[in-house]
Structures are given as structure tokens and as C-alpha cells.
């Protein structure tokens, strides 16, 4: 449990004002985001049957919260880590047209998360997915989509400034594109997270591309499941966050795997046993559209725009009492 206490922290808004600001940010952002990317809101599951292969395996070591239900005692059911694969199936199931897509309010539990200022076991994000043509599976499509998302986030900065000028955290005016290999080449002696901090402190906002594959050093920058993002066409939107003196990830996204790239990545990840799961069979049999998608952290975005020191100020979760006590002593009011 690593907790950062900013010096002389002033939350600016009361707890009740913060709650109202959270509502405003969430409602305004999802409307603007949906319009800009041509996305429709869909209801989404909080849990899925384990056997479908629809849950997000994250880095491959986290275990989902699972249970059985009275009317289906033989079926193992998992609370989702994310909806990365479910969304792609939903686009097919509900006949979304080319260049249209969906977003949903995703709530997840990641019980193996290491708790700190920005990590919680409760995850709330706008999960989104959009149909693209096979010919659009390239860096140009990825970068254009990132620029659109950045534009919406910048627009939200203005909206928050208009309503809460005393509280808004000011963002950089542009986003820069850097690959994980470029980062390793430049900062070979730093850890991956230290590299992210260094480049974000220098540039303000970065889209860090190509996460999941092995770098020249033989190490990975970070883990990614092998069966949704194409590791050559994905990345994270990171902001330098002055209150915590570190990079803050707001979104993880990417162009999704093709049949070929999924097989390649499953082999690299030694996860070829997944090929026989229903989701993977649908993809291999050309039954799913080519897509781009990702997740945007709702609490993280609120935290960023309001200059909060702890994600627990903008979401209700469970925290160690020692963390709660230390936060309260320093004007950090955990919900």
C-alpha cells in the first residue's frame, strides 16, 4: 500500500460539491464523447459465465471474483474485469453499421489490485467499441481516434472551469505520440513506470503506443491480454499529474486483434488453449467485425479534472483503515 500525501493539500470543493461535480462531469463527458465518436449507449453485464471466454484476463495473473447462482449451480460466473471482448460480440449481435459503435458504463471488481492514490478494487469506466474496416487497422486510425478523445477531455476542462473555476486542474494543449521502444531506448536504466513519469513530466500528455509485446531488452513494458488489443496498434493516454508528481493513466485503448494477430499473440503468451473458447472461435471464423475500442476511467477523469489527491475522493470503495485515517489527517476526504 503506497500512499502519496501532497504537501499542503487543499481539496477546494466540499464533499457535497465534489459529488455534484462528479455527476456533472460524468453526464457531460459521456454525451460529448458519444457524439464525437458516433457511439450509442448500451446496457452491459456486470458478470459473465466463465466458459464463454468473454472476461478480460488483464495481465494473466489476476483472478476474477466468481460465484454460482441458485438456478445454475453448475455454471461458474465471473464479475467482469472489463468488457473488452463482450463489446465486440455486442457490435455483431446488435448489427452496428460501419463507423458506428457503443459505449457503456462498466463497473468491475479487480480484487488483486495494489491499492494506492490511483488504484482501487472498484473500477468504473466508459467502455467503448466501434466498427472499422479491415483497411483501417493502422496507426493513422489509432492516432486520429486518440486525438478525438483528447479533444473531448480538453473540452471537459473548459466545462469544469466554467462551473468550478477554483477547482479545475489545467491540462496541456496537445498530446504526443511515443512508442514503448522509443521510451526504453531513451531511458534504458529506468523501470517502465519511471519512464512513463519521465516522459509525461517532459511533455505533459502522451499516448504511449505498442504495449504488450517484448522490447529489445527482452522485457515487456507492461502486460496486455493477447486476445483483444493488437499489441502493435494499442496504447495508453497518460497525463502528467502535478499533485502526485507522477503519470496518470486515463485510458487504455487500441485496435483489436485480427484473426492472424490473435493467433500470433496467443502463441507468444502461451495461451493457445483459449482458441477453443466461443469468443475466439467466433473471431477465427470471421464472425466478428474489425473494431477499435477501449476504456476511459470515470473516477480517474474526475480526479484529474478536479485536482484530487486520491481516487477515493471521487468513488466509493473499500480501503484499509490506516489509509483512510492518514488521508483524513491531510484533508483528503475518502467517500
UniProtKB/Swiss-Prot annotation:
EC number: 6.3.1.1
One Pfam assignment: AsnA
PROSITE patterns assigned to the protein according to its UniProt record, in alphabetical order: AA_TRNA_LIGASE_II
Alphabetized InterPro entries for the sequence: aa-tRNA-synth_II (IPR006195), aa-tRNA-synth_II/BPL/LPL (IPR045864), AsnA (IPR004618)
Keywords, ordered alphabetically: Amino-acid biosynthesis, Asparagine biosynthesis, ATP-binding, Cytoplasm, Ligase, Nucleotide-binding
Reactions this protein catalyses: L-aspartate + NH4(+) + ATP = L-asparagine + AMP + diphosphate + H(+)
Main location class: cytoplasm
GO biological process, one term: L-asparagine biosynthetic process
Keyword field contains Protein biosynthesis: no
Subcellular location as annotated: Cytoplasm
PANTHER family attached to this UniProt entry: ASPARTATE--AMMONIA LIGASE (PTHR30073:SF5)
HAMAP family the record matches: AsnA (MF_00555)
Protein known as: Aspartate--ammonia ligase
Gene source species: Pediococcus pentosaceus (strain ATCC 25745 / CCUG 21536 / LMG 10740 / 183-1w)
Lineage of producing organism: Bacteria, Bacillati, Bacillota, Bacilli, Lactobacillales
Amino acid at each position: 500500500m503506497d500512499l502519496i500525501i501532497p504537501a499542503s493539500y487543499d481539496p477546494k470543493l466540499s464533499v457535497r460539491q465534489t459529488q455534484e461535480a462528479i455527476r456533472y462531469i460524468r453526464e457531460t463527458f459521456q454525451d460529448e464523447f458519444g457524439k464525437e465518436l458516433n457511439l450509442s449507449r448500451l446496457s452491459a453485464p456486470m458478470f459473465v459465465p466463465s466458459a464463454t471466454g468473454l472476461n478480460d484476463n488483464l495481465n494473466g495473473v489476476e483472478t476474477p471474483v466468481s460465484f454460482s447462482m441458485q438456478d445454475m449451480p453448475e455454471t461458474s460466473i465471473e464479475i467482469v474485469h472489463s468488457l473488452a471482448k463482450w463489446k465486440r460480440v455486442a457490435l455483431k449481435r446488435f448489427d452496428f453499421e460501419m463507423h458506428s459503435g457503443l459505449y457503456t458504463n462498466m463497473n468491475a471488481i479487480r480484487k488483486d489490485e495494489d491499492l494506492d492514490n490511483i488504484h482501487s478494487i472498484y473500477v468504473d469506466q466508459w467502455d467503448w467499441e466501434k466498427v472499422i474496416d479491415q483497411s483501417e487497422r493502422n496507426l493513422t486510425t489509432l492516432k486520429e481516434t486518440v486525438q478525438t478523445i483528447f479533444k473531448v477531455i480538453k473540452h471537459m476542462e473548459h466545462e469544469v472551469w466554467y462551473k468550478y473555476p477554483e477547482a479545475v486542474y489545467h491540462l496541456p494543449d496537445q498530446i504526443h505520440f511515443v512508442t514503448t521502444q522509443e521510451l526504453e531506448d531513451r531511458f534504458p536504466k529506468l523501470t517502465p513506470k519511471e519512464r512513463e513519469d519521465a516522459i509525461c513530466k517532459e511533455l505533459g500528455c502522451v499516448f504511449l503506443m505498442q504495449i504488450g509485446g517484448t522490447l529489445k531488452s527482452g522485457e515487456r513494458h507492461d502486460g496486455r491480454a493477447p486476445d483483444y488489443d493488437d499489441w502493435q496498434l494499442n496504447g495508453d493516454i497518460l497525463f502528467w499529474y502535478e499533485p502526485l508528481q507522477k503519470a496518470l493513466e486515463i485510458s487504455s485503448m487500441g485496435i483489436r486483434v485480427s484473426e492472424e494477430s490473435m493467433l500470433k499473440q496467443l502463441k507468444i503468451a502461451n495461451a493457445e488453449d483459449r482458441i477453443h473458447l466461443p469468443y475466439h472461435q467466433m473471431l477465427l471464423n470471421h464472425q466478428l467485425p474489425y473494431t477499435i475500442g477501449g476504456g476511459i476511467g470515470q473516477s480517474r477523469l474526475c480526479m484529474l479534472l478536479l485536482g484530487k489527491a486520491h481516487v477515493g475522493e471521487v468513488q466509493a470503495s473499500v480501503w484499509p483503515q490506516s489509509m483512510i485515517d492518514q488521508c483524513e489527517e491531510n484533508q483528503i476526504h475518502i467517500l
